[in-house]
Amino acid sequence: MSAALETRDVGRFPEQVIETIDFLDGTTPERSPFASLVAMPSGNTSPEVFVLGSSPYGALLAAELGLPYTYAHFIGGDAVPILRMYRERFKPSARCDKPYAMMALAAIAAPSDEEAEELTWPVALWRLRLFRGDSSPVPSLAQTQAYPWTPLERSEVAATRRIIAGSPQSIRTAIETKIAEHGADEALIVTIAPDYGTRLRSYELIANALARTREVVAQV
């Protein structure tokens, strides 16, 4: 099914979302080329479907289809007008009877603010290379420190930074502030780090810091 859905035609995206939901719900029309496909393993429930986006397009699609919406804060800029539009245009559906907004946040935690800040630079270098067509893995701290940063590159990093970094307390304050500012129902935390151990430690620190706050979903 993934091969059949693979297309760069943005205009077909709404149709593809509907096809995916039908597939998950077992309600694919007989005339569909996917009618003979069966989701396995099957069960009595269907997974939740969120529309992830950072522009009005995804928000409007989620609102029109009555689906939860996840705003990709680590990509976009000002989420307030987009989430407002989503809530105002939302049409209740069998899957979701009222607007449900999630904030997807890039965050990295360390025992101290200073260490966390240092850990943002490998991610910055990785993104810089990615924009230049280099898809190599996230570099190590040593590789990042050895990289000959130019003033222009440093300014680009500062201008496009979308990551929350700090000690557990700093992270907790920053995430709670983001949720409150946008009236989000939930937060999803994404951590990119030079190695698995650093990434796992970050998730553990964030989870412990947010143990008594609103629901936070951390996916390792």
Indicate where each model-derived feature is located.
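Substrate-access "cap/lid" subdomains that shape
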Residues: R31-V49, T70
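A conserved active-site cap/scaffold subdomain adjacent to cofactor or substrate pockets
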Residues: S54-A79, L83
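Glycine-rich, proline-tolerant flexible connector loops at the mouths of alpha/beta enzymes
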Residues: H73-I75, V190-T198
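An alpha-helical appendage that flanks or caps ligand/catalytic pockets
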Residues: L5-V38, D78-A184, A211-V220
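Acidic/polar active-site rim loop that often engages polyanionic ligands
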Residues: M1-L5, E64-L65
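Active-site mouth loops of central-metabolism enzymes
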Residues: G43-G53, A159-P168
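Hydrophobic faces of well-ordered beta-strands that scaffold small-molecule active sites
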Residues: E48-L52, L67-A72, P99-A106, A187-V190
